[in-house]
Amino acid sequence: MVRKDRRPNVLLITCDQWRGDCLSAAGHKVVRTPNADALAAEGVLFRQHFGGAAPCSPARACLYTGLYQMNNRVCRNGTPLDARHGNIALSARSLGYDPTLFGYTDVSPDPRTLAPGDPRLRSYEGVLPGFTVRQLLPEHQKPWLSWLEARGIDSSAGFPGIHRPADEIVAATTDGAVTTSPPVYSKDETPAAFLTGEFARWLGEQEGDTPWFAHLSFLSPHPPFIVPEPYNKIYDPADGTTFRRAANWQAEAQSHPYLAYELGQQQRANFRPGAEGKVRDWGDDNFRRIRALYYGMISEVDAQLGRIWQAVKAADAWDDTIIVLTSDHAEMMGDHFMLGKGGFFDGSFHIPLIIRDPRRRKAAGASVDRFTEAVDIAPTLLDLLGEVFPPHLDGQSLKPFLDAGEPDNWREAAHWEFDFRSVADADAERHFGIGPRQCNLAVIRTKQFKYVHFAGGLPPLLFDLEKDQDELSNVAADPAYLPVRLELAERLLAWRAEHLDQSLALAELTEDGVVGHVAGLPLFQS
C-alpha cells in the first residue's frame, strides 16, 4: 500500500557500460533480462535514452548534476568536479534524506577544497558530495577481494588478475583466442552479488517510517569481460545481431582521423586481463565470444536485480519506493571493430532507462520513444519528490511521461559530448597537433540524421540514419546533404547557446535586492 503521508523512498541503480538495446523488454532477440523487464512492466521504459558524455566520470557528472558536460566541465576520468556545483545527493540531503552509497560514483574532488597532500587527490574515484558511504567498491575492488578471502577464495591475484579464468587458461593464447572459462568466484560471489547483499543488510536496518535514499552503483557489465557459470555458457557466441562495421578495420580507420586514432589506441588487456595486442585485430570469433560473455554479465546483474526487488518487498517498501534503473554509458561491443566507450557512435551512448514510481500507475508498462538524456534524471527525481527543480539545470523532468502524458515542447534530438584530451600525457594532443581545448566533439542526433562537430579542424561527420543505420557512410561532404549539414550545425550551435551556464545568468541585482534564480550549494536550491 502506498503511504501518502511521507516522502517516498528512492532507489537509484546505475550499471556500467550497459547498452540500451540489450534488454529483452526493448526487443533484444538474444539477451534475457526478466527482472529488468518486470520493473518495466510496472514502470516506464525509455527506449531512446542517451548518456551525456563518456567515459565514467564525465557520464556520471551529467547524471548526478543535471548539467551537460559544457557546464559541469568534467572532461575525462580524473577531471575534478567544480565544488560550486551541487548534485542530486546534496539535494536529497537538503530534503531530509540520508543518501547512502553502495559502490562508487567516480567523481574527482575539487583540489581547491583540499590540502595539497590529501590522498583523495591521487585517485579519480572520489565520492560524490552528499553521499554517506555504506559500502565503497572502487576499481581496485579491495573490499570485495577481502570478502572473497573470508569465504575461502584465493584473491591474492588482486585486480584485475582475479578476473582471469580459474583453470589458468590465459585470456589470450598465442593466436589471441578468447576463452569463455569462468573465474575462481561463483555466481553468488560476484562484485554485484556482494553489493546486493550489503544493500539488503542495510535495508533491514532502516526504520519503517523514515524514507530512505540508496544508490547502488554496479561495475558490471564493464570489463574485464568474464563471468561465472552458468552465465558464461547461457549465450551461444553464434547468436546476436550483426556487428555494425565496415568490411575491415582499415576501412573504418580511413573514414575519419579520430577513428584511426581510437582504433590504434585500444589494447586487448583493458578488456581481457593477460591478452596482448590491439582489439582491432581480433577476428569475428573472438568478438562473438566476448559478446556472449557480455550478454552473460548483463544476465548476472539482472539476477541481482531480482534479489534487490525481493529485498525491497520483504522490507514492505515496494509500494513506497521510486526505482530508477540506468547506466552511465554503453559499450561498442565489436561494432566498428571496437570495444569500450567514447567517440560518437550510438553504441557508446544509447543506454537503458526504466523508472517506476508506485504512485503513478497510469503509464505502467508503457514505453517512450521520445529522446531523453542522462541530464533528465536529477530534475525528474526532484520533481517526483515534490520539489520544483531550478531553471539553470540542463535536463528536464520526465514526470509527465510517467503520468501517461508528454511535456510541452519536448526535444526533437538527443545531444552528447565527448572530450578526448589527455592532460596527463598529452597523447591525443600530440597525435592531432592540437591543444587540449580542441580535443572534443559534440553530437546532435535526430530520428533521421546524426551530425558530429569536431573542434581543432577535424572534419565533421553526417550520417543519414534512415539509409545508413550502421553509421558507415559520412555524407557531410555530399552536395546533396549540405542543406541538412547546415541545418544541424545551426541547431547544434543554438543548443549550445541555449545551454550556456545559467548559474548566475538568471539572476539580477536590483534596488529591491536579488531578482530571479541563483544557483547555490546545494545546486537545487534557489
Where are the language model's segments positioned?
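A contiguous, mid-protein "functional segment" used to position or interact
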Residues: 482-506
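Formylglycine-dependent sulfatase
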Residues: 1-450, 460, 470-490, 517-526
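Short, charged, surface-exposed hinge/linker loops at domain edges
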Residues: 501-519
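Short beta-strand micro-motifs enriched in acidic
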Residues: 452-454
